[in-house]
Design a protein with these regions (language model features):
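Bacterial N-terminal signal peptides
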Residues: 7-15
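N-terminal segments that cap or nucleate solenoid repeat domains
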Residues: 20-51, 66
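Hydrophobic face of amphipathic alpha-helices that form TPR/SEL1-like repeat modules
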Residues: 42-49, 53, 77-85, 89, ...
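Canonical positions in the second alpha-helix
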Residues: 31, 66-67, 102-103, 138-139, ...
Length: 176
C-alpha cells in the first residue's frame, strides 16, 4: 500500500513537471513566432542542445537565423558556428565567415577570434595577416586566451607586423 501511494505521488509530480515544461516551451514558441529575437535565440539554443526538446539542428538553424537577421549578436555567432561545423547545414566557410563578421562587428569576442583565424589561414575569405592581427587584437584585449596566443605567434613570426619578440612574449604570457 505504501509503495502504491508513493508511486501515485511520483506520477502526479512527474505529470505536473511535464505539463509545466510543455507550457514553457509553448510560451517560448509563441513569442518566437511573434518575432521576439530573444525568444527565437533561446528556442534555437534549446533545439541545438536538446534542452527540454528533442535535439534538432534544422530547427535550431531556422530560429538562429530568424534571430540573427534581427541583429542578435549571439545568434549570429551561433549561426556562424553551425556553418563552420556543418551542424544541420552543409559546411560553408564563406557563410560562416559572413555570420562571424556580423557578430564580431557587434563585439562578440569568440566571433572576433574566429575572424582572426579565418583571415590568418584564408578560410572562407582571402588570407590577410593585417586583418587577422586586427581581430586577434580585438579579442585578445578582452581576455580571449586563444587570441592572445595566436597574437603572440603573429608577432613572433613577423606576420602583418614587424617581428617583435617583446610583444610576442607579452601575448604569450597572457595566452597561457
Amino acid at each position: 500500500m505504501f509503495k502504491l501511494f508513493f508511486s501515485f505521488i511520483f506520477l502526479i509530480i512527474f505529470s505536473l513537471t511535464l505539463s509545466a515544461k510543455e507550457s514553457f516551451i509553448s510560451r517560448i514558441e509563441g513569442l518566437a513566432n511573434r518575432g521576439f529575437s530573444d525568444a527565437q535565440y533561446n528556442l534555437a539554443r534549446m533545439y541545438a542542445n536538446g534542452e527540454s526538446v528533442e535535439q534538432n539542428f534544422i530547427s535550431a538553424e531556422y530560429w538562429f537565423r530568424k534571430s540573427a537577421e534581427q541583429g542578435n549578436v549571439d545568434a549570429q555567432y551561433q549561426l556562424g558556428r553551425m556553418y563552420d561545423a556543418g551542424l544541420g547545414v552543409p559546411i560553408d566557410k564563406k557563410e560562416a565567415f559572413k555570420w562571424y563578421a556580423l557578430s564580431a562587428e557587434q563585439g562578440s569576442i569568440e566571433a572576433q577570434y574566429n575572424l582572426g583565424l579565418a583571415y590568418r589561414f584564408g578560410v572562407g575569405v582571402e588570407q590577410n595577416f593585417t586583418k587577422s592581427l586586427k581581430w586577434y587584437k580585438e579579442s585578445a584585449s578582452k581576455g580571449h586566451s586563444g587570441a592572445q596566443y595566436n597574437l603572440n605567434l603573429l608577432f613572433e613570426e613577423g606576420l602583418a607586423t614587424r617581428k617583435d619578440i617583446s610583444d610576442a612574449i607579452k601575448w604569450y604570457r597572457c595566452g597561457r
